[in-house]
């Protein structure tokens, strides 16, 4: 059984884009990233009274999301708020649910969702999240719903052709179509780079960097909760550390967080963690590392030092957290099996060359024999089967 992650809504229908809700969510997320749930007690502001409850959940084992041991309690709800947590035997309610010693917890937060368009084209599909106990969905990882270029195509939504450029417009569409979960977005710096610079391996001029910063500012004003990167994928792979600091510093003015799929998760893992920490330190924001791992068996020993780097940053006063997925597989686009240098002229230009047999032979040889880059063929066992 799951209670809403903000411990105040029970209908699960509101998108959390308005300032008070965002501020509360930011505070809760920052405090509880490592467990990806929000404290049931710490984020509830509803006061109990002696009146009847609308709903009373009894005989529950409560896991509050704050790292505490579970405890037995009853939960009283009035309207869309949790009114009381404790021993409520004998209290009246319009509806009583016997939890029968099951666990009751705050709703889980999906820390890295990637269904930006699906939420609009098929809102009921979000029910699959609810059935897993997920009540808040954080979307991003370099790519994001906004900003979009005026040249980006419209999206087919329930019979309508809709386009948007900003998060403000995107959130309006979410509210118009309605979704059954809370939705939170960061601004993907891949998106920002693509709108201003395209897909090529180029560095921004001073004027272009200011344009990129303005896009981040607009996204934060519209309700984004931070910036995100996916630094193994073009064109994000071409961004310098300094560029990422400058853009994330803008998000820091709004209490934002830096979320990152780091530049390397294998032989250069430690350098990638150092870069993530440097970006957070330079921008003055908390850092959250997506799916921390040491890919490739030869790199497994690096994990101890990786955790030591994070612990050291935390001991020094930085807010650095990470998540790990509980399986040994990896999902990645086939384009990531090729060296990023091949995309320097843009993805479309590279794809036009793939019909050349000589290039295809060169690509295969490079994948099978080199390792001075994050070569995922090497990490997964060097076997095409």
Model-inferred region functions:
Residues 147, 229-239:
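Glycine-rich, proline-tolerant flexible connector loops at the mouths of alpha/beta enzymes
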Residues 174, 179-180, 185-206, 210-233, ...:
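Active-site neighborhoods of metal-dependent hydrolases
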Residues 91, 96-169:
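Metal-associated gating/positioning segment near the N- to mid-region
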Residues 48-54, 62-107, 123:
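Histidine-rich, glycine-flanked metal-binding segment
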Residues 60, 80, 101, 112, ...:
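Divalent metal-coordination and catalytic microenvironments
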Residues 13-32:
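Bacterial N-terminal signal peptides that target proteins for export
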Residues 242-253, 257-286:
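Extended hydrophobic/aromatic segments used for targeting, binding, or gating
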């Amino acid at each position: 059984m799951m209670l809403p992650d903000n411990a105040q809504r029970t209908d699960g229908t509101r998108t959390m884009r308005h300032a008070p809700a965002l501020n509360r969510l930011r505070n809760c997320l920052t405090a509880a990233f490592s467990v990806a749930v929000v404290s049931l007690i710490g984020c509830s502001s509803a006061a109990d009274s002696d009146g009847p409850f609308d709903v009373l959940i009894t005989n529950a084992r409560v896991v509050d999301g704050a790292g505490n041991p579970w405890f037995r309690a009853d939960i009283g709800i009035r309207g869309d708020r949790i009114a009381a947590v404790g021993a409520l035997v004998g209290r009246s309610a319009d509806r009583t649910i016997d939890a029968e010693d099951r666990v009751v917890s705050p709703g889980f937060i999906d820390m890295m969702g990637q269904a930006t368009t699906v939420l609009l084209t098929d809102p009921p599909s979000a029910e699959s999240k609810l059935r897993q106990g997920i009540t808040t969905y954080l979307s991003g990882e370099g790519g994001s719903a906004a900003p979009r270029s005026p040249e980006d195509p419209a999206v087919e939504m329930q019979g309508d052709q809709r386009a948007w450029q900003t998060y403000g417009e995107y959130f309006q569409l979410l509210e118009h179509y309605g979704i059954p979960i809370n939705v939170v977005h960061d601004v993907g710096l891949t998106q920002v780079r693509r709108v201003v610079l395209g897909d090529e391996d180029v560095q921004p001029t001073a004027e272009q960097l200011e344009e990129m910063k303005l896009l981040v500012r607009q996204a934060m004003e519209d309700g984004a909760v931070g910036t995100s990167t996916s630094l193994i994928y073009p064109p994000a792979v071409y961004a310098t550390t300094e560029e990422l600091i400058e853009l994330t510093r803008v998000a820091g003015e709004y209490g934002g967080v830096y979320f990152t799929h780091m530049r390397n998760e294998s032989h250069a893992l430690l350098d990638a963690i150092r870069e993530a920490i440097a970006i957070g330190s330079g921008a003055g924001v908390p850092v959250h590392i997506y799916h921390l791992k040491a890919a490739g068996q030869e790199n497994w020993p690096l994990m101890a030092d990786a955790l030591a780097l994070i612990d050291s940053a935390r001991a020094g006063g930085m807010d650095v957290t990470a998540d790990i997925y509980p399986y040994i597989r990896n999902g990645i686009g086939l384009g990531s099996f090729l060296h990023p240098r091949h995309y320097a002229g843009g993805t479309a230009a590279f794809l036009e060359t793939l019909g050349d047999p000589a290039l295809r032979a060169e690509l295969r040889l490079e994948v099978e024999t080199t390792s001075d880059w994050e070569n995922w063929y090497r990490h997964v066992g060097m076997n095409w089967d």
